[in-house]
Amino acid sequence: MAITDVAEYAHLSDADLEALGVELDAIRRDIEGSRGEKDSAYIRRTIAFQRFLDIAARLVIAGTRGKVGWALGTTALTIAKSIENMELGHNIGHGQWDWMNDPEIHSSTWEWDMAGVSSQWRYSHNYRHHMFTNVIGVDDDLGFGVLRVTRDQKWQRSNLFQPLRNVLLALMFEWGIAAHGLHSEHERATTDAEKSAVTHALIRKMARQAGKDYVFLPALSLRRWRRTLTANVAANLLRNVWAYIVIACGHFADGAEKFTPAALEGETKPEWYLRQMLGTANFDVGPIMAFLSGNLCYQIEHHLFPDLPSNRYAEIAQRVRGVCANYDLPYTTGPLVRQYLLTFRTVSKLALPDRFLTATSDDAPETASENRFRNVDTPYVSRDGTGDRRRRGLVTAIRDRQIRRHSRKFVHAGTSAH
């Protein structure tokens, strides 16, 4: 089952939990206090570069004849669309640049180059997902309603098709996000008129988006309309797949924990911080790939501070790593390919009923709870007043459990041999 008592699972005392919150609050204050011209210049350069790349890509597609020109133009267009969606649309929509008071670069005015309506996405994502990250039955992003990513989600026959659903979701990700936002808006609407209004808003946005990419821009290419159309289709599909990989690795990889609704009862800010740290995962890439991911390779930092500028996440990550080390908490990260393979493994194996799975629901790679440590002799050492930060926390508890498990297997193997 999923985690109910987050502090118990993390092996933190009440005093440690409060101290953790103080340290993370200090990081927020430091970044907020140091925002300035360098940050605003960064986002303006990014907008200018993205628009230049978008125009250049379309000129290459329309102005060249061979396959090489089409491939180069389509690649550039894919990159431009990825930057617009992730480093711009996603992060501006989080209010990361609202402090600039620039009406163009503001969460309330920016409309992204995607099928969904930005305002609908902001409610489903910024509130329902970020406030209730990985809480089963509350966070709609947990499997997006089509994937079973924890054993706490009841198995159904339709889950057998999960590997195929996974591929289709990746290819159609922007349309899935659009439908996801509409679903959230319908749930909070109180009248049929409100539901109708948000539905028509989405239909209009989808029509504009499809008309731009698949009718208007190809028509501008005249006799080369097929070349432009296929490039736009390919760029949108590739952007969708990339966005899906980034998001899936940040939430479904091993180590990104899930929580029961009971974990929300009386939740304090330090407990919210802790849930975000345990419920997300990073992946390791260089600065270029980090930029192309919208700096969402720093998913842990993004969930701790979703409204701080994305260009500061690398700096924040160094301090968050230190906090995790101080409290013996895992800092879940790994190479991008490895993180996605772990995600795909989870999606594939949870397509099967639980009776075909070997690990328990309290101690599986994708699903764990505080029960994995109960009735186990794991000494707990809190920090004392001497400044000694050595402790036995979650990282140590997991390591000790793995050692005991391997020891039991070794003993069992030796006994069987005799």
What are these regions (language model features)?
Residues 1-56:
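Low-complexity, highly charged intrinsically disordered N-terminal segments
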Residues 1-20, 362-418:
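Transit-peptide-like, low-complexity N-terminal presequences
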Residues 9, 24-41, 252-283, 305, ...:
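Polar-ligand-bearing catalytic/cofactor-coordination segments
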Residues 36-41, 58-65, 418:
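Catalytic cores of phosphodiester-bond-cleaving enzymes
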Residues 39-42, 107-111, 196-201, 223-228, ...:
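Glycine- and acidic
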Residues 46-72, 216-221:
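Alpha-helical phosphate/pyrophosphate-handling elements in metalloenzyme active cores
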Residues 71-81, 132, 136-276, 281, ...:
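Hydrophobic transmembrane alpha-helical segments that form the core helix bundle
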Residues 78-196, 264-354:
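Membrane-embedded catalytic scaffold of the fatty acid hydroxylase/desaturase
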